[in-house]
Amino acid sequence: MKKLLSVSTLLVLLVGSVLAENHNKKFEKGAAICQQIAQDYNIEVEVKKVSALPNNAAACCMRKGEGKFIIKLDWNYTCSMTDNIVTPTLIHEMAHAVTNNCGHNQKWVNAIYDLVDYFPYMNRYEANIVNQEVEKAE
């Protein structure tokens, strides 16, 4: 019984570490793409993981100055979800940064359409999440 419990615990830890690694890989890849986008749009963007955000937000884009933004992802929330949430969240927040706009209006939607081209590796689940965001705004 003790052995079964030990094996079960190790299996759970292994699965958890693999899932966390997938989240980290998507985050690192997405953060690098965000830097390319920032360069193309002539803005500065810092992408960070944080342990919590106000009002249970999953992510936020904050203005730090003229042409300077910080994107924060609630990593506890993000890791509790599928790793398919990482890329759409980065696209959503980058659209706010490149438009210097905190609303979900046509300007933001147009930015989403432009930004998805930077993420050719998106799978259909991620693309569906982005489409749902756009549909809500339109």
What does each of the following model-derived ranges do?
Residues 4-14:
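Sec-dependent N-terminal signal peptides
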Residues 15-20:
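Sec/Tat signal peptide C-region and signal peptidase I cleavage site
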Residues 23-44:
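Zn2+-dependent metallopeptidase catalytic core
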Residues 41, 101-138:
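Post-HExxH zinc-binding segment in Zn-dependent metallohydrolases
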Residues 49-70:
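Catalytic zinc-binding patch centered on the HExxH motif and its immediate surroundings
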Residues 71-89, 100:
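Short pre-active-site segment immediately N-terminal to the catalytic Zn-binding motif
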Residues 93:
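Walker B catalytic acidic pair
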Residues 97:
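Short alpha-helical functional segments enriched in proximate histidine and acidic residues
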